[in-house]
Amino acid sequence: MSSENAAASATPARTFGFVSVLVIGILAATQSADPGITSVAMPSIAKDLGFSGAGLSLAVSIGTLSLAATVIAIGALADRIGVRRVIMIGLVLEALGNLIVAVSPSLAVLLLGRVVAGVGMGALFAGAFSMVPAIAGKRTIAAVIGQWTGLLYIFTIIFSIIGSALIGISWRAGFILIPVVCLIMMLVVPKTLPETPRRGSSKFDFLGLSTLGLGMVLVLVAVSLAATSLGSPTFWICLIIGIIMLGLFAVIEKKSPNAAFPIELFKSPVFVAAVL
């Protein structure tokens, strides 16, 4: 075993206390507060940048769409490089995405920023949740999740209040809060969170995850269009191609020896009931 893998395996044996739980609570709260801050700022953004209707709807939802489309891929990446590294990547992406939004001169740049931030949000929330067993130690996982959830709610409220106050000054100022928090967390995370063991031998299921991501994005776009554009060609094109891509994902995962998602889980009534 290499010294790097030995260190990674030994790290979780350390004891991590309340500070570590506090950190993952703050990490998850950045993801939780971000969409709310965006929604509060959106009327001012739309007026300033001159868009409405479909553009406004897409600007509000595209961050969540990119989060949903990449969350499984993020889990697969964490298996390869470790959860803490995924969290650090998420911090960089969410900070960068919000900064792009803060300086955006047009709807296109704004959407780019929201996509980048959405991927970062997915990495942070998934990473924070995945850290719970690593920092639980002698405590029960349920107890740590209880503390984490409480801190998540508290800091979501705090960040939302501060973000809304900054938006009252300028909507661009509202998007500076999350990058500042992310920058602080970049300094704190390496000192307070353990690195998790990595499965470096597994191959990355790029084809399967790509079809899943594209399929989820198209279906979610179709759902967002359903309320106002049920009869439009765009709605049906997104829906049909999205369903085809999800079906292709299922076929790929069933045949792949390195499947990112065990498709056989859907044979379990308990799993299906939990998902629904």
Task: Identify the function of each model-found stretch.
Residues 29, 65, 99-100, 115, ...:
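Hydrophobic residues within the alpha-helical transmembrane core of Major Facilitator Superfamily
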Residues 36, 67-72, 156-157:
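Residue-level signature of mid-helix packing/kink "hotspots" within the transmembrane helices
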Residues 59-67, 152:
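Transmembrane alpha-helical segments of major facilitator superfamily
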Residues 75-206:
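Helix-loop-helix hairpins in multi-pass membrane proteins, especially solute transporters
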